[in-house]
Swiss-Prot record:
This is Acidic phospholipase A2 beta-bungarotoxin A4 chain. Its main location: secreted. It comes from Bungarus multicinctus. GO terms for biological process: arachidonate secretion; lipid catabolic process; phospholipid metabolic process. Its cofactor is Ca(2+). Residues 1-19 form the signal peptide.
Amino acid sequence: MNPAHLLVLSAVCVSLLGAANIPPQHLDLYQFKEMIRYTIPCEKTWGEYADYGCYCGAGGSGTPIDALDRCCYVHDNCYGDAANIRDCDPKTQSYSYKLTKRTIICYGAAGTCARVVCDCDRTAALCFGNSEYIEGHKNIDTARFCQ
């Protein structure tokens, strides 16, 4: 075998071995992450919204502590409504959308799982972009502040 071909084949094998260790990511959550990145200030990362207030991140309880936390509260409830659509899992549902001119356009028939989930994510991402991020509300003691 040609040494150049062997080198390329080895590089491909090493790349595939590395890729096999990357956990799969829910497509919808990836799409939501892209929407968030599009709407938030440049100095923030989408991950800074994953453990904020009482509702941004896994679970949620109590009263939202500010406008940004209310965005997450509304998003959680929207996902709850979407889950009532037959065979709809909002966390894994993919959808079609376009990021354009500082807004987000969702495609698909109204009332379908894909469109409802896209609209949930769109509304939340735009809300994030219009809400103040308060550093002191990141990683709060939810047992104390979210009753």
